[in-house]
C-alpha cells in the first residue's frame, strides 16, 4: 500500500469514525435468519463509549448479523442505553451477568449461543474502521474456507475533536498477506508475536469460524472459562483456538480503531490479577500444547517469565495465587511430557518460593 492509497484509506476511516461518534442512529433493523456473522461485545460501565461502538456495527454494509451484548454487572447507565438500542434493532441480544465475571466468561457465553458462521469480538470502546469491514472479512473467510482471519488495527489514545492527529497505526512487519496452516499454526501465534506486533495475541483483531471457537471453548471447559480473569484472557483462549484450527490468514485490511486509554488493563490491573492471568496461561500451555520441542520451550519460557516477573512478590499474603501456582508447577515437574532437565530447571527456580 503506497502513501497515497494509505492516506485515502485513512481519510475514509476518519469519515466513518466521525459518523459513529457524532450521529445518533434511529434506523430500525430486523434480524435476518440465519445471520452470516455474530458480533460479540462485552460491556462493563461503558456508558460513554458503547453508542459509538454500536454505531460502527449498525452502519456496516453486512446487515445479516446478530449483535450479542453481554452486560457484565455494570452499575452505570450502560443497561439503559443498550435497552434503548434494542428497541430499534432486533438483531441485538442482551445477556446480563449476575455478577462481574470478566471478559473471558462474557465472550464465551455469547459465543455459545451465537448463530453466525463467523464470530467478531469488539471491545466496548472500539469501533470498526469503515462500513465495509465485516462484509469484506466475512467474504474472504467464506470464499477461502478460513478458520481464523486477522486484520490491521489503528490505536486511539483519546476520543477528542482532533482525533485524527492522535492516530497511531499498528504497522505489521509482514508486507503481504500471511497464510499459515497446521501443524505450524499451533505455536505460530506466540512464536511470531514480536514480528507480528504486540497485539497478535488479542481476540479483538480477529474473525473466527464459530464451529472452531465453540470447540475451543468446550475443550477449555466451564471450570476454566468461568474464572474471573482480567489478564492474559485473550492469549489463553487464542492459544487453544490456534491449536485446533486448520488455518489462519492475516489480511492487509484496516479493520478496527482500538482504544488505548490510561484506564486499560495494562495500566490498571493490580499485580495479583496479572499474576493469576500468567499462571492461568501457563496452565493452558501445559494442557493444550503438543509433544514437540517448541511447545515444551513455550511452557518453560512462561514458567521462567513468571519467576523473573514475580520473584519478589509476597506470596505469603496471596494464598490463592500461591496454591494455584503450586498446583500448576507440581503438574509440570511430575509429568513425563517435559524432560528431566526442564523439570530440574523449574524446581531450581521456584525452590526459594517454598512452592515446590
What are these regions (language model features)?
Residues 179-270:
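Conserved nucleotide-sugar donor-binding catalytic segment
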Residues 97-114, 124:
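Glycine-rich, basic loop-to-helix element that forms the pyrophosphate-binding segment
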Residues 119:
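Short aromatic/hydrophobic "clamp" motif used to bind/position activated sugar donors
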Amino acid at each position: 500500500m503506497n502513501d497515497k492509497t494509505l492516506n485515502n484509506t485513512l481519510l475514509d476511516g476518519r469519515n466513518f469514525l466521525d459518523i459513529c461518534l457524532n450521529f445518533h442512529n434511529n434506523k430500525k433493523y430486523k434480524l435476518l435468519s440465519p445471520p452470516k456473522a455474530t458480533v460479540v461485545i462485552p460491556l462493563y460501565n461503558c456508558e460513554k463509549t458503547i453508542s459509538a461502538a454500536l454505531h460502527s456495527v449498525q452502519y456496516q454494509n453486512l446487515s445479516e448479523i446478530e449483535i450479542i451484548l453481554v452486560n457484565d454487572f455494570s452499575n452505570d447507565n450502560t443497561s439503559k442505553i443498550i435497552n434503548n438500542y434494542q428497541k430499534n434493532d432486533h438483531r441485538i441480544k442482551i445477556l446480563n451477568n449476575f455478577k462481574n465475571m470478566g471478559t473471558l466468561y462474557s465472550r464465551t457465553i455469547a459465543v455459545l449461543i451465537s448463530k453466525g458462521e463467523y464470530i467478531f469480538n469488539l471491545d466496548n470502546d472500539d469501533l470498526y474502521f469503515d462500513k465495509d469491514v465485516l462484509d469484506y472479512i466475512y467474504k474472504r473467510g467464506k470464499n477461502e474456507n478460513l478458520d481464523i482471519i486477522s486484520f490491521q488495527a489503528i490505536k486511539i489514545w483519546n476520543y477528542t475533536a482532533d482525533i485524527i492527529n492522535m492516530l497511531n497505526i499498528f504497522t505489521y512487519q509482514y508486507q503481504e498477506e500471511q497464510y499459515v496452516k497446521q501443524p505450524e499454526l499451533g505455536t505460530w501465534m506466540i512464536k511470531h508475536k514480536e514480528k507480528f506486533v504486540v497485539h497478535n495475541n488479542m481476540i479483538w483483531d480477529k474473525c473466527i469460524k464459530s464451529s472452531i471457537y465453540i470447540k475451543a471453548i468446550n475443550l477449555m471447559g466451564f471450570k476454566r472459562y468461568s474464572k474471573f480473569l482480567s489478564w492474559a484472557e485473550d492469549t489463553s483462549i487464542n492459544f487453544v483456538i490456534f491449536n485446533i484450527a486448520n488455518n489462519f490468514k492475516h489480511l492487509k485490511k484496516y479493520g478496527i480503531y482500538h482504544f488505548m486509554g490510561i484506564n486499560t488493563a495494562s495500566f490498571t490491573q493490580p499485580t495479583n490479577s496479572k499474576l493469576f492471568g500468567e499462571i492461568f496461561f501457563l496452565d493452558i500451555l501445559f494442557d493444550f500444547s503438543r509433544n514437540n520441542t517448541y511447545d515444551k520451550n513455550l511452557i518453560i519460557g512462561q514458567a521462567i517469565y513468571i519467576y523473573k516477573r514475580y520473584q519478589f512478590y509476597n506470596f505469603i499474603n496471596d494464598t490463592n495465587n500461591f496454591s494455584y501456582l503450586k498446583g500448576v508447577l507440581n503438574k509440570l515437574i511430575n509429568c513425563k511430557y517435559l524432560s528431566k532437565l526442564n523439570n530440574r530447571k523449574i524446581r531450581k527456580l521456584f525452590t526459594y518460593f517454598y512452592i515446590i
